[in-house]
């Protein structure tokens, strides 16, 4: 049975009544629009003829499949699939019906939140499918995915390891690579980096040595390179990742030129593919956006986000795959951060609202992205100077996340809130101790460690401990220059410039502020441009350069006006009320604001 098509295999096609009923059922199923009720009637009529066990089992499977895919009657679908699974186990040489029924039934159990019923069913199917390579591999993948959704990554990794060894034994290096790459992905999620490195090395060798269908080979390479790129990005190594990212972009270009011929490998265990070509294309756009965001190439991030979102809109018209919504949410999360940096808060807020709406449609999506949503709202609150709300959002996000990198990112931003408030020393010292870049830093991310040095420098600056601040900021500069972290470089330079200005070293201050301004313009980072232009104005005034001082003052005025206008627009949006949401599902309706209710002092 292909998907939900109602067909009769050769062995069961001898009865003319059976063929006639199947023909009618398939006609009704494929009508435009489909006439599912009539299709179901035709299939149910098969039982009136007291059919053989084979026909009975297959008809139960077909009914279960049609009801599962085309109706909301999951109870009746479950009854038919359970009968198909029960009867087919008593019939020899009936693997396609037996394992299709097991696979579909466990999927239905999961949809009904009966995971405890799905697991033993899949385990039994795996146990009795060892002589059927395609189904054995497919069922192993399915059970591994179920464990992954339950966050039981250890069990999922074990199953993928079993699958890889089985694929090797049955001579399928292609599917062995798929199992190993999937395991590598989970090990990366678990941060088991000691196990990831040898596994990725082995995968690289298998992928390069495998000679088979060009699209399958290139899709393996895309999977392999995506893991490598995300591994580097997780580690905050924006410069080191460039060769891998370039290879990945070339690889997706190669795939897009290959013809999508039907892949019919001689080994049934090879009948898998990782992702459709179009999904891979969006994924490559996505990792490119992630790289551009971290590196501070925000216009490039915007360009690739637009391309990816356009592609996603087209795909979602034809494909309801949940992975597309995940891609869309991750893209929006990154572009929202870009907007906040480039001074487009109102647009960022509307996109946060869009993420809320996407999460409303899927409890799993919301569960996976709730912490990120509150983090984004916290960043938005900082940008509009609502520090109490920012603290509440970050505290909520910390409660919801188990992801170490995200936890560290949130704590770093929460520390910046406490520094700005100036009266939260006890909480601040506690936070800074937990993200001490000199001692037991919680994650291996180069970028986050550099940011932790910056936060220390900022705190020392506010306390008037300028030499200590300079030490921390020089450490940030050294780390950010090593990996092309442009935003951190710009922030560190302007803060160092400010310190030298306060100390009366105008020449050294100028040496810091001018490159900070140039870099901030290139990113573009509006808050650093605002800060730099104010410093340049004061520096030039102190040095008696009145023309340059006037020019810098004009720049500062322009940036202030732009930010002020955007600030007023954002705070006037009904979505601004999202800043008070800290519990449960995101609100759908927003009350319009009468006008901005937040202080503008931080902008001027």
Curated annotation (Swiss-Prot):
Location, primary (coarse class): nucleus
Keywords for the protein's UniProt record, in alphabetical order: Cell cycle, Cell division, Chromosome partition, Mitosis, Nucleus, Repeat, TPR repeat
Gene3D superfamilies cross-referenced by the UniProt entry: Tetratricopeptide repeat domain
A GO CC term assigned to this protein in UniProt: chromatin
Keyword Cell division attached: yes
InterPro entries noted in UniProt: MAU2 (IPR019440), TPR-like_helical_dom_sf (IPR011990)
Compartments where located: Nucleus, Nucleoplasm
GO biological process: cell division; chromosome segregation; maintenance of mitotic sister chromatid cohesion; mitotic sister chromatid cohesion
Effects seen without this gene: Early embryos exhibit numerous developmental defects including shortening of the A-P axis, ventralization, and defects in neural, somite, head, eye, and tail development.
Subunit note: Interacts with nipbl to form the cohesin loading complex.
Family recorded in the similarity comment: Belongs to the SCC4/mau-2 family.
Protein name: MAU2 chromatid cohesion factor homolog
Lineage: Eukaryota, Metazoa, Chordata, Craniata, Vertebrata
